[in-house]
UniProtKB/Swiss-Prot annotation:
It comes from the Bacteria. This is S-adenosylmethionine decarboxylase proenzyme. Heterooctamer of four alpha and four beta chains arranged as a tetramer of alpha/beta heterodimers. NCBIfam families: SAM_DCase_Eco. Pathway: Amine and polyamine biosynthesis; S-adenosylmethioninamine biosynthesis; S-adenosylmethioninamine from S-adenosyl-L-methionine: step 1/1. It is an enzyme of class 4 (lyase). The keyword S-adenosyl-L-methionine applies. The record marks 111-112 as: Cleavage (non-hydrolytic). Belongs to the prokaryotic AdoMetDC family. Type 2 subfamily. Gene3D superfamilies: S-adenosylmethionine decarboxylase (3.60.90.10). The active site is at 112 (schiff-base intermediate with substrate), 117 (proton acceptor), 140 (proton donor). PANTHER family: S-ADENOSYLMETHIONINE DECARBOXYLASE PROENZYME.
Protein backbone atom coordinates (compact mmCIF):
# COMPACT_ATOMS: atom_id res chain seq x y z
CA UNK A 1 0.00 0.00 0.00
CA UNK A 2 1.33 3.44 -0.94
CA UNK A 3 2.31 5.54 2.07
CA UNK A 4 -0.18 8.31 2.83
CA UNK A 5 0.64 11.92 3.50
CA UNK A 6 -1.92 12.85 6.13
CA UNK A 7 -3.59 16.09 7.06
CA UNK A 8 -3.06 16.27 10.82
CA UNK A 9 -3.12 13.29 13.18
CA UNK A 10 -3.98 9.75 12.07
CA UNK A 11 -7.53 9.37 13.44
CA UNK A 12 -7.99 5.67 12.72
CA UNK A 13 -8.75 3.45 15.71
CA UNK A 14 -7.32 -0.06 15.52
CA UNK A 15 -8.54 -2.63 18.03
CA UNK A 16 -7.18 -6.10 18.65
CA UNK A 17 -9.17 -8.29 21.02
CA UNK A 18 -8.80 -11.95 21.73
CA UNK A 19 -9.87 -14.67 24.13
CA UNK A 20 -7.46 -17.36 25.24
CA UNK A 21 -8.62 -20.59 26.86
CA UNK A 22 -6.74 -23.08 29.00
CA UNK A 23 -8.49 -26.42 29.58
CA UNK A 24 -7.84 -28.85 32.43
CA UNK A 25 -9.31 -32.05 33.90
CA UNK A 26 -9.46 -32.27 37.70
CA UNK A 27 -10.69 -35.60 39.00
CA UNK A 28 -11.98 -34.55 42.44
CA UNK A 29 -13.58 -31.47 43.96
CA UNK A 30 -10.33 -30.81 45.85
CA UNK A 31 -8.35 -30.96 42.61
CA UNK A 32 -10.81 -28.61 40.90
CA UNK A 33 -10.42 -26.11 43.72
CA UNK A 34 -6.67 -26.57 43.51
CA UNK A 35 -6.60 -25.88 39.77
CA UNK A 36 -8.69 -22.73 40.13
CA UNK A 37 -6.39 -21.50 42.91
CA UNK A 38 -3.30 -22.36 40.84
CA UNK A 39 -4.43 -20.66 37.63
CA UNK A 40 -5.77 -17.68 39.56
CA UNK A 41 -2.36 -17.16 41.15
CA UNK A 42 -0.49 -17.80 37.89
CA UNK A 43 -2.42 -15.02 36.17
CA UNK A 44 -2.83 -12.61 39.05
CA UNK A 45 -2.92 -8.85 38.59
CA UNK A 46 0.82 -8.43 39.15
CA UNK A 47 1.79 -10.98 36.47
CA UNK A 48 -0.75 -9.57 34.02
CA UNK A 49 0.65 -6.09 34.65
CA UNK A 50 4.13 -7.35 33.77
CA UNK A 51 2.83 -8.88 30.52
CA UNK A 52 0.94 -5.75 29.50
CA UNK A 53 3.85 -3.49 30.43
CA UNK A 54 6.10 -5.51 28.13
CA UNK A 55 3.40 -5.24 25.46
CA UNK A 56 3.62 -1.47 25.76
CA UNK A 57 7.38 -1.72 25.32
CA UNK A 58 6.99 -3.81 22.16
CA UNK A 59 4.67 -1.33 20.48
CA UNK A 60 6.53 1.69 21.84
CA UNK A 61 3.68 3.03 23.98
CA UNK A 62 4.21 5.36 26.92
CA UNK A 63 2.32 4.34 30.05
CA UNK A 64 0.17 7.05 31.62
CA UNK A 65 -1.71 5.04 34.23
CA UNK A 66 -2.12 1.46 35.46
CA UNK A 67 -5.25 0.19 37.23
CA UNK A 68 -5.19 -3.40 38.47
CA UNK A 69 -7.34 -5.53 40.74
CA UNK A 70 -7.51 -9.12 41.98
CA UNK A 71 -11.01 -10.37 42.77
CA UNK A 72 -12.53 -12.78 45.28
CA UNK A 73 -13.14 -15.64 44.92
CA UNK A 74 -11.08 -15.50 41.70
CA UNK A 75 -10.24 -13.43 38.65
CA UNK A 76 -8.18 -10.32 37.93
CA UNK A 77 -8.20 -7.29 35.66
CA UNK A 78 -5.60 -4.78 34.51
CA UNK A 79 -6.09 -1.64 32.41
CA UNK A 80 -3.23 0.51 31.12
CA UNK A 81 -3.68 3.91 29.50
CA UNK A 82 -0.94 4.87 27.04
CA UNK A 83 0.02 7.92 25.01
CA UNK A 84 2.02 8.92 21.96
CA UNK A 85 5.25 10.79 21.42
CA UNK A 86 5.99 12.52 18.08
CA UNK A 87 6.99 10.02 15.40
CA UNK A 88 7.42 10.25 11.64
CA UNK A 89 4.66 8.06 10.08
CA UNK A 90 6.92 7.45 7.07
CA UNK A 91 9.26 5.48 9.33
CA UNK A 92 6.60 3.03 10.49
CA UNK A 93 6.63 -0.44 8.96
CA UNK A 94 3.07 -1.14 7.76
CA UNK A 95 3.75 -4.38 5.91
CA UNK A 96 2.02 -7.66 6.78
CA UNK A 97 4.44 -9.78 8.80
CA UNK A 98 4.74 -11.25 12.29
CA UNK A 99 5.57 -8.89 15.11
CA UNK A 100 8.49 -9.41 17.49
CA UNK A 101 8.45 -11.29 20.76
CA UNK A 102 10.20 -9.07 23.31
CA UNK A 103 12.07 -6.77 20.91
CA UNK A 104 11.01 -3.15 20.61
CA UNK A 105 9.17 -1.69 17.64
CA UNK A 106 9.57 2.06 17.14
CA UNK A 107 5.98 3.28 17.20
CA UNK A 108 3.81 5.31 19.52
CA UNK A 109 0.15 5.55 20.45
CA UNK A 110 -2.37 8.17 21.51
CA UNK A 111 -5.74 7.97 23.34
CA UNK A 112 -5.18 4.23 23.63
CA UNK A 113 -5.53 1.46 26.16
CA UNK A 114 -4.53 -2.12 26.85
CA UNK A 115 -6.65 -4.23 29.19
CA UNK A 116 -7.08 -7.83 30.33
CA UNK A 117 -9.70 -9.64 32.40
CA UNK A 118 -9.52 -13.27 33.58
CA UNK A 119 -12.31 -15.78 34.17
CA UNK A 120 -11.44 -19.09 35.92
CA UNK A 121 -14.35 -21.54 35.73
CA UNK A 122 -15.21 -25.12 36.66
CA UNK A 123 -18.27 -27.35 36.77
CA UNK A 124 -19.08 -29.35 39.92
CA UNK A 125 -19.65 -32.48 37.82
CA UNK A 126 -17.52 -33.93 35.07
CA UNK A 127 -14.13 -32.61 36.19
CA UNK A 128 -13.67 -30.04 33.41
CA UNK A 129 -12.10 -26.68 34.28
CA UNK A 130 -11.48 -23.75 31.97
CA UNK A 131 -9.53 -20.54 32.28
CA UNK A 132 -10.33 -17.64 29.96
CA UNK A 133 -8.50 -14.36 29.55
CA UNK A 134 -9.93 -11.50 27.48
CA UNK A 135 -7.34 -9.06 26.16
CA UNK A 136 -7.88 -5.86 24.20
CA UNK A 137 -5.26 -3.58 22.67
CA UNK A 138 -6.85 -0.45 21.20
CA UNK A 139 -4.76 2.25 19.53
CA UNK A 140 -5.17 5.55 17.76
CA UNK A 141 -2.23 6.42 15.55
CA UNK A 142 0.00 5.02 12.88
CA UNK A 143 0.65 1.45 14.05
CA UNK A 144 -1.52 -1.65 14.29
CA UNK A 145 -1.70 -3.39 17.69
CA UNK A 146 -1.20 -6.64 15.75
CA UNK A 147 2.51 -6.05 16.32
CA UNK A 148 1.97 -7.26 19.91
CA UNK A 149 0.04 -10.39 18.94
CA UNK A 150 3.05 -12.71 18.68
CA UNK A 151 4.33 -11.83 22.13
CA UNK A 152 0.95 -12.18 23.82
CA UNK A 153 0.23 -15.61 22.33
CA UNK A 154 3.66 -16.82 23.46
CA UNK A 155 3.16 -15.48 26.98
CA UNK A 156 -0.35 -16.91 27.40
CA UNK A 157 0.26 -20.43 26.07
CA UNK A 158 -3.27 -21.56 25.31
CA UNK A 159 -5.31 -24.44 23.96
CA UNK A 160 -7.77 -22.23 22.07
CA UNK A 161 -7.45 -18.63 20.89
CA UNK A 162 -10.08 -16.47 19.18
CA UNK A 163 -8.88 -13.16 17.75
CA UNK A 164 -10.71 -10.13 16.36
CA UNK A 165 -9.12 -7.12 14.67
CA UNK A 166 -10.98 -4.12 13.32
CA UNK A 167 -10.19 -0.64 12.04
CA UNK A 168 -12.74 2.12 12.72
CA UNK A 169 -13.15 5.73 11.72
CA UNK A 170 -11.22 7.47 8.97
CA UNK A 171 -8.30 9.80 8.44
CA UNK A 172 -7.73 12.36 5.68
CA UNK A 173 -4.81 12.87 3.38
CA UNK A 174 -3.53 16.31 2.38
CA UNK A 175 -5.97 16.36 -0.56
CA UNK A 176 -8.97 15.87 1.75
CA UNK A 177 -9.68 12.28 0.68
CA UNK A 178 -10.86 9.96 3.46
CA UNK A 179 -8.97 6.72 4.14
CA UNK A 180 -10.68 4.01 6.19
CA UNK A 181 -7.56 1.84 6.61
CA UNK A 182 -3.90 2.73 6.28
CA UNK A 183 -2.15 -0.64 6.01
CA UNK A 184 -2.46 -3.86 4.06
CA UNK A 185 -4.04 -6.90 5.70
CA UNK A 186 -5.86 -9.94 4.38
CA UNK A 187 -5.45 -12.22 7.42
CA UNK A 188 -4.45 -11.94 11.06
CA UNK A 189 -2.39 -15.09 10.45
CA UNK A 190 0.12 -13.05 8.46
CA UNK A 191 1.15 -11.34 11.69
CA UNK A 192 2.00 -14.64 13.42
CA UNK A 193 5.40 -16.31 13.44
CA UNK A 194 5.85 -19.72 11.81
CA UNK A 195 6.35 -21.48 15.14
CA UNK A 196 2.91 -20.34 16.33
CA UNK A 197 1.22 -21.31 13.06
CA UNK A 198 2.80 -24.77 13.23
CA UNK A 199 1.19 -25.43 16.63
CA UNK A 200 -2.43 -24.58 15.77
CA UNK A 201 -5.18 -25.42 13.34
CA UNK A 202 -6.62 -22.06 12.26
CA UNK A 203 -9.52 -20.67 10.28
CA UNK A 204 -10.49 -17.14 9.25
CA UNK A 205 -13.82 -15.34 8.97
CA UNK A 206 -13.12 -11.89 7.49
CA UNK A 207 -15.38 -9.05 6.33
CA UNK A 208 -12.93 -7.11 4.18
CA UNK A 209 -15.29 -4.32 3.15
CA UNK A 210 -15.90 -3.52 6.83
CA UNK A 211 -12.24 -3.89 7.86
CA UNK A 212 -13.15 -6.69 10.29
CA UNK A 213 -10.88 -9.73 10.64
CA UNK A 214 -11.40 -12.86 12.74
CA UNK A 215 -9.14 -15.87 13.33
CA UNK A 216 -9.74 -18.97 15.46
CA UNK A 217 -6.92 -21.22 16.70
CA UNK A 218 -7.06 -24.75 18.12
CA UNK A 219 -3.95 -26.55 19.41
CA UNK A 220 -3.05 -29.43 17.08
CA UNK A 221 -1.29 -31.82 19.44
CA UNK A 222 -3.28 -33.44 22.24
CA UNK A 223 -1.38 -35.16 25.05
CA UNK A 224 -3.52 -36.15 28.02
CA UNK A 225 -0.72 -35.63 30.55
CA UNK A 226 -0.76 -31.89 29.81
CA UNK A 227 -4.43 -31.64 30.78
CA UNK A 228 -4.46 -33.57 34.06
CA UNK A 229 -4.16 -31.71 37.35
CA UNK A 230 -2.33 -33.67 40.09
CA UNK A 231 -3.17 -36.97 38.37
CA UNK A 232 -0.96 -38.88 35.95
CA UNK A 233 -2.59 -40.69 33.01
CA UNK A 234 -0.79 -43.93 33.93
CA UNK A 235 -2.68 -43.93 37.24
CA UNK A 236 -5.93 -44.34 35.30
CA UNK A 237 -7.39 -47.34 33.52
CA UNK A 238 -7.47 -47.36 29.74
CA UNK A 239 -11.23 -46.83 29.82
CA UNK A 240 -10.87 -43.84 32.17
CA UNK A 241 -8.23 -42.31 29.90
CA UNK A 242 -10.51 -42.68 26.89
CA UNK A 243 -13.51 -41.13 28.67
CA UNK A 244 -11.47 -38.15 29.92
CA UNK A 245 -9.81 -37.65 26.52
CA UNK A 246 -13.22 -37.64 24.81
CA UNK A 247 -14.55 -35.13 27.38
CA UNK A 248 -11.59 -32.77 26.96
CA UNK A 249 -11.57 -32.96 23.17
CA UNK A 250 -15.32 -32.32 23.01
CA UNK A 251 -14.95 -29.32 25.35
CA UNK A 252 -12.16 -27.86 23.21
CA UNK A 253 -14.07 -28.29 19.96
CA UNK A 254 -17.22 -26.72 21.44
CA UNK A 255 -15.26 -23.65 22.52
CA UNK A 256 -13.44 -23.48 19.17
CA UNK A 257 -16.62 -23.69 17.08
CA UNK A 258 -18.73 -21.69 19.54
CA UNK A 259 -21.55 -24.21 19.77
CA UNK A 260 -22.58 -27.27 21.75
CA UNK A 261 -21.82 -30.61 20.10
CA UNK A 262 -24.33 -33.42 20.81
CA UNK A 263 -22.88 -36.47 22.54
CA UNK A 264 -22.82 -39.57 20.36
Amino acid sequence: MKKLKLHGFNNLTKSLSFCIYDICYAKTAEERDGYIAYIDELYNANRLTEILTETCSIIGANILNIARQDYEPQGASVTILVSEEPVDPQLIDKTEHPGPLPETVVAHLDKSHICVHTYPESHPEGGLCTFRADIEVSTCGVISPLKALNYLIHQLESDIVTIDYRVRGFTRDVNGMKHFIDHEINSIQNFMSDDIKSLYDMMDVNVYQENIFHTKMLLKEFDLKHYMFHTRPEELTEEERKVITDQLWKEMREIYYGRNIPSV
